[in-house]
C-alpha cells in the first residue's frame, strides 16, 4: 500500500521525505547514519519513491522504481549507496574482520552474504510481485517484497563460508530466529548411531519384524545382529536351553524315587485303627420286665485301650449312664445324643433295628474322638469291661 504524501500546506512539509516533518537527520529515526534527509537517495524508508504532492504513485511506476532500487542495492554490494544500519552493526560485531561471526538476530534468506542479517532481502522467484508490501516497522530493513532472481545475489561473496556444506548449514540456521544453534538437530556424516528402531529392552516376542530399511550402518555395541534382551543385563537363554527334570517348588519327599508297596503293606493292619460295632440285639424277660441288650465288638491297636479285641453286651439304660459320665468328665467335648426312647411297640423288629443303628453311630463318634480317647477313663471300661457297672462311676 502506498503512503500518503504530505501536501504543500501541511506543517513540516518536506519534498524529500515521504513521512513529512523534519529536515534534521538526527531527529529522523529512519535516516541512515552519517547522512541527512536533503542528501539522501531518492529511496524512502518505505522502499518507494516519494509520491507527487497530494496524490498516489501508480502501480507500474512503483514496480519500475522497486526493480531499479533492487538492482542498485545488488550492485552496491549490500543495500545501496549509503551504508545501511545492518552493515555497520555487522562491521562492529565482526571483531576479527574475517566475516565469520555467529548469527545474533534476524538472519535473512541470503545465507551466503551476511550471517548477521541486518538488512537482507527475501527473494522468492516463484511468488508474484507485491508492490504494496511495506517495510519492517522495527527498522531492520528486511523487506518482504518478492522480486526477480538475480545472478549477482547468488554468487558467493568474499566473506562467505568456505565450503558448500557450511553454506547449507548457514541456510538451515537462517530458519531459526535469534541465532538458535541447530547443530544438535543436524545429521552426522556417519551412519545412524546405536541400535535400530526395533532393538530395545522390550521382550522380542512383543516386537514386530524389523524391516530391511531400519538396519544399522555402524559397528557399534548394539548392532543389527545383536540379540534382543528380555531385560537390561539379562540376555536370552541359549537355543539348547532345557527345562530341568524336577521343579524347584516340589516337595523334598516327592523328589525321591517312590517306594513300591508290598502286599503286606497294602493289605496289612494300619498303624492306628479303631472299629466299634453294635450287633446281635436280644430281648430278655417277660411282661413288664422285658428289655433288649446289644453286643458291642471293639477292634483296635490304640494304646488307650487295654484289649485289641473285646465283646460286651449293654442295654439301652447303660448307654444313658455312660453318656452322663462322659459329659461330667469331658466338658470341652460336645457329646452326641442317643436315639430317642420308644414307649409303644418298642420290641418290634423295626424299632429294635433303628435303635441299634443309632447306638452304633453314637459309639463310633465318641470312641473316635482324640480327646475322649486320651482323657476319658470310662470309655475303655464301657467298651471292653464285661463287669462294668454304673455304680462304680456315679
From Swiss-Prot:
Residues 179-207 have a biased composition (Polar residues). Residues 1-82, 116-226 are annotated as: Disordered. One of its GO terms (biological process) is protein transport. It is a peripheral membrane protein. GO terms for cellular component: early endosome membrane; Golgi membrane; retromer complex. Residues 31-82, 131-178 have a biased composition (Low complexity). A 1,2-diacyl-sn-glycero-3-phospho-(1D-myo-inositol-3-phosphate) binds at residues 315, 317, 341, 346, 355. It holds the Pfam family PX. GO terms for molecular function: phosphatidylinositol-3-phosphate binding. SMART domains: PX. Residues 272-389 form the PX domain. Coiled coil: none annotated. Its main location: cytoplasm. It is found in: Cytoplasm; Golgi apparatus membrane; Prevacuolar compartment membrane. Keywords: Cytoplasm, Golgi apparatus, Lipid-binding, Membrane, Protein transport, Transport. Required for retention of late Golgi membrane proteins. Component of the retrieval machinery that functions by direct interaction with the cytosolic tails of certain TGN membrane proteins during the sorting/budding process at the prevacuolar compartment. Binds phosphatidylinositol 3-phosphate (PtdIns(P3)). The PX domain binds phosphatidylinositol 3-phosphate which is necessary for peripheral membrane localization. Belongs to the sorting nexin family. This is Sorting nexin-3. It comes from Mycosarcoma maydis. The lineage of its organism: Eukaryota, Fungi, Dikarya, Basidiomycota, Ustilaginomycotina.
Amino acid at each position: 500500500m502506498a503512503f500518503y504524501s504530505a501536501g504543500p500546506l501541511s506543517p513540516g512539509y518536506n519534498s524529500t521525505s515521504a513521512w513529512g516533518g523534519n529536515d534534521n537527520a538526527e531527529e529522523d529515526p529512519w535516516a541512515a547514519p552519517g547522512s541527512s534527509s536533503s542528501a539522501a537517495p531518492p529511496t524512502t524508508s518505505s522502499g518507494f519513491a516519494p509520491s507527487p504532492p497530494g496524490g498516489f504513485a501508480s502501480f507500474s511506476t512503483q514496480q519500475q522504481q522497486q526493480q531499479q532500487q533492487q538492482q542498485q542495492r545488488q550492485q552496491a554490494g549490500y543495500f545501496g549507496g549509503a551504508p545501511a544500519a545492518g552493515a555497520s552493526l555487522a562491521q562492529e560485531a565482526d571483531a576479527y574482520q574475517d566475516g565469520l561471526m555467529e548469527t545474533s538476530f534476524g538472519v535473512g534468506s541470503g545465507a551466503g552474504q551476511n550471517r548477521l542479517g541486518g538488512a537482507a532481502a527475501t527473494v522468492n522467484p516463484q511468488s508474484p510481485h507485491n508492490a504494496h508490501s511495506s517495510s519492517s516497522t522495527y527498522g531492520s530493513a528486511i523487506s518482504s517484497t518478492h522480486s526477480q532472481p538475480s545472478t549477482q545475489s547468488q554468487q558467493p561473496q568474499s566473506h562467505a563460508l568456505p565450503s558448500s556444506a557450511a553454506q547449507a548449514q548457514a541456510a538451515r540456521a537462517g530458519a531459526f530466529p535469534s541465532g538458535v544453534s541447530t547443530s544438535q538437530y543436524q545429521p552426522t556424516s556417519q551412519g545412524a548411531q546405536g541400535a535400530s528402531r526395533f532393538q530395545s529392552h522390550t521382550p522380542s516376542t512383543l516386537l514386530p519384524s524389523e524391516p530391511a530399511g531400519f538396519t544399522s550402518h555402524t559397528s557399534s555395541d548394539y548392532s543389527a545382529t545383536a540379540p534382543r534382551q528380555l531385560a537390561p543385563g539379562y540376555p536370552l537363554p541359549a537355543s539348547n536351553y532345557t527345562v530341568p527334570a524336577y521343579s524347584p517348588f516340589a516337595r523334598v519327599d516327592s523328589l525321591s524315587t517312590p517306594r513300591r508297596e508290598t502286599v503286606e503293606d497294602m493289605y496289612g493292619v494300619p498303624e492306628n485303627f479303631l472299629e466299634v460295632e453294635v450287633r446281635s440285639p436280644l430281648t430278655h424277660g417277660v411282661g413288664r420286665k422285658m428289655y433288649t441288650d446289644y453286643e458291642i465288638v471293639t477292634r483296635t491297636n490304640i494304646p488307650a485301650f487295654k484289649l485289641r479285641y473285646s465283646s460286651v453286651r449293654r442295654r439301652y439304660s447303660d448307654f444313658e449312664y455312660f453318656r452322663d459320665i462322659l459329659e461330667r468328665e469331658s466338658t470341652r467335648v460336645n457329646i452326641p445324643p442317643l436315639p430317642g426312647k420308644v414307649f409303644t411297640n418298642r420290641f418290634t423288629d423295626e424299632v429294635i433295628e433303628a435303635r441299634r443303628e443309632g447306638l452304633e453311630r453314637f459309639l463310633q463318634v465318641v470312641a473316635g474322638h482324640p480327646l475322649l480317647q486320651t482323657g476319658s477313663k470310662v470309655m475303655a471300661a464301657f467298651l471292653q469291661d464285661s463287669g462294668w457297672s454304673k455304680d462304680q462311676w456315679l
